[in-house]
């Protein structure tokens, strides 16, 4: 209710009561004013009531919510179901226009405002997480998950380069959507095998440079590197890769899917942008901001390239993933976001200690990757630990499966999600996009041992870690 209407209410009830009400509504208006002026995360997150008030106020700016509006066009933001309308807070027009995903819509000032504010909040959150300003000239939040966003990024890079640049040099990462994003963009993936460094699987920089010389600079569009990954693979050497790309004038796209929560990765991205060439780095919204799957953020030091990606997106887009991030960041606030990052870092140390203790008690080994991989762990698997486990042996015989693969299914049946078993005894081969991979899932052809991977990702709790260790212990020691 605006001030004029509140003053009118003084003719209906006591003026002193209305003065109190004016004070209360002024507090809300001040919060909204601060958000609109500063466009940053509030220091303390807003409660759900305040966020809903903000959403309802802004949605009234869209034409489909005008009281006297009539629509005679083909796309008028009509919503049949009341549940659907409630779910979207009345936002029906999506984001962007046919020529640009970030262009403002005449019919949807509210939706356009939400998009603009969300981009500003995301930039603020990324800086708070540890990215330097020089690496963040702009960002683009798209309603597509990471794989499709990577494909659009490479398509855009391809559109501004000569057509003969067909090859993408890709240090092997056994995640299907990464490879498929290259193929979807109509490009040819050139797999760069990794190399072993102790327990770690690492980037082979010499192999990258040799392949550049072999194929020719004029034929290579970019190097497609990866930061966040499952141990024992560790993040690619993106600083050195960026320097190679700068030296040869080759594009560099970084898949930073869930790396936004890791300060070491963000420091390396900032350094790569400063010392070499980085065209864009892409991160997932669900893995970093704890929202439903469906969004990804494109960032980079070159604002013009990010704008070009925006212009290349065909048509309008769904605004739900943008709205999810907007609500979540307002709910977290600056302190909530920083606390989540801090807690994850502390629990990483605790998880490492508990896994090390477990490994010692069960004659296994926690692979030594923590100095480079600050999110994921890998624990060796030895058949000796399961020779007397009647449940696993029985299931293994009945299903004709390998013992190690049964461990993963048994963990899942005990409500432990997210762990992965890499069984190297099976010599698993997989064909993707015409390329055959040996021991798929391990990121390398010849790793020495089977293992179990887990992750210490943002939002994990100490209780989850303790419960996982307990359930894993029962599986190892069940007679």
Swiss-Prot record:
It is found in: Cytoplasm. The record marks 74 as: May act as a substrate filter by repelling compounds with a negatively charged alpha-carboxylate. Its EC number is 2.9.1.2. This is O-phosphoseryl-tRNA(Sec) selenium transferase. InterPro entries: PyrdxlP-dep_Trfase, PyrdxlP-dep_Trfase_major, Sec-tRNA_Se_transferase, SepSecS/SepCysS. Substrate binds at residues 97-98, 105, 316. TRNA binds at residue 414. The modification N6-(pyridoxal phosphate)lysine is found at residue 287. It catalyses: O-phospho-L-seryl-tRNA(Sec) + selenophosphate + H2O = L-selenocysteinyl-tRNA(Sec) + 2 phosphate. It comes from the Eukaryota. The gene is sepsecs. Converts O-phosphoseryl-tRNA(Sec) to selenocysteinyl-tRNA(Sec) required for selenoprotein biosynthesis. One of its GO terms (molecular function) is O-phosphoseryl-tRNA(Sec) selenium transferase activity. Gene3D superfamilies: Type I PLP-dependent aspartate aminotransferase-like (Major domain). Keywords: Cytoplasm, Protein biosynthesis, Pyridoxal phosphate, RNA-binding, Selenium, Transferase, tRNA-binding. Residues 1-44 are annotated as: Tetramerization. Its cofactor is pyridoxal 5'-phosphate.
């Amino acid at each position: 209710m605006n001030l004029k209407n509140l003053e009118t209410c003084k003719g209906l009830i006591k003026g002193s009561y209305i003065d109190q009400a004016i004070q209360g509504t002024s507090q809300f208006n001040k919060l909204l004013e601060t958000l609109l002026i500063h466009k940053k995360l509030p220091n303390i997150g807003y409660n759900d009531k305040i966020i809903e008030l903000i959403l309802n106020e802004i949605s009234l700016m869209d034409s489909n919510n005008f009281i006297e509006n009539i629509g005679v066009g083909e796309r008028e933001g009509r919503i049949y179901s009341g549940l659907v309308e409630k779910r979207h807070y009345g936002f029906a027009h999506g984001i962007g226009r046919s020529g640009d995903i970030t262009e403002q819509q005449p019919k949807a000032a509210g939706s356009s405002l939400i998009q603009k504010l969300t981009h500003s909040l995301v930039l603020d959150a990324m800086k708070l997480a540890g990215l330097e300003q020089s690496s963040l000239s702009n960002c683009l939040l798209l309603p597509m998950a990471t794989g499709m966003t990577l494909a659009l990024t490479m398509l855009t890079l391809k559109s501004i380069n000569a057509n003969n640049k067909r090859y993408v040099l890709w240090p092997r990462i056994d995640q299907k959507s990464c490879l498929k994003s290259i193929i979807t963009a109509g490009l040819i993936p050139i797999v760069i095998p990794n190399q072993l460094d102790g327990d770690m699987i690492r980037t082979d920089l010499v192999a990258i440079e040799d392949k550049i010389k072999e194929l020719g600079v004029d034929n290579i569009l970019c190097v497609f590197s990866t930061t966040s990954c499952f141990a024992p693979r560790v993040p690619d050497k993106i600083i050195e890769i960026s320097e190679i790309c700068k030296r040869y004038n080759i594009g560099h796209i970084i898949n930073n899917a869930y790396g936004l929560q890791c300060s070491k990765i963000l420091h390396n991205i900032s350094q790569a942008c400063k010392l070499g060439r980085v065209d864009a780095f892409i991160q997932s919204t669900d893995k970093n901001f704890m929202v439903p799957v469906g969004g990804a953020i494109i960032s980079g030091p070159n604002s013009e390239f990010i704008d070009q990606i925006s212009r290349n997106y065909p048509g309008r887009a769904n605004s739900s993933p943008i709205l999810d991030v907007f609500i979540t960041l307002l709910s977290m606030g600056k302190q909530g976001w920083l606390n989540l990052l801090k807690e994850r870092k502390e629990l990483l140390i605790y998880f490492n200690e508990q896994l090390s203790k477990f490994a010692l008690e069960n004659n296994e080994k926690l692979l030594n990757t923590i100095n480079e991989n600050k999110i994921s762990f890998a624990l060796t698997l030895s058949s000796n630990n399961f020779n007397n486990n009647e449940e696993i042996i029985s299931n293994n015989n009945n299903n004709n499966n390998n013992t190690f693969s049964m461990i993963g299914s048994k963990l899942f049946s005990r409500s432990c999600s997210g762990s992965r078993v890499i069984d190297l005894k099976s010599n698993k081969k997989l064909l993707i996009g015409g390329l055959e991979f040996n021991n798929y899932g391990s990121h390398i052809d010849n790793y020495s041992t089977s293992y179990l991977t887990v992750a210490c990702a943002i939002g994990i709790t100490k209780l989850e870690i303790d419960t996982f260790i307990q359930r894993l212990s029962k599986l190892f020691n069940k007679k």
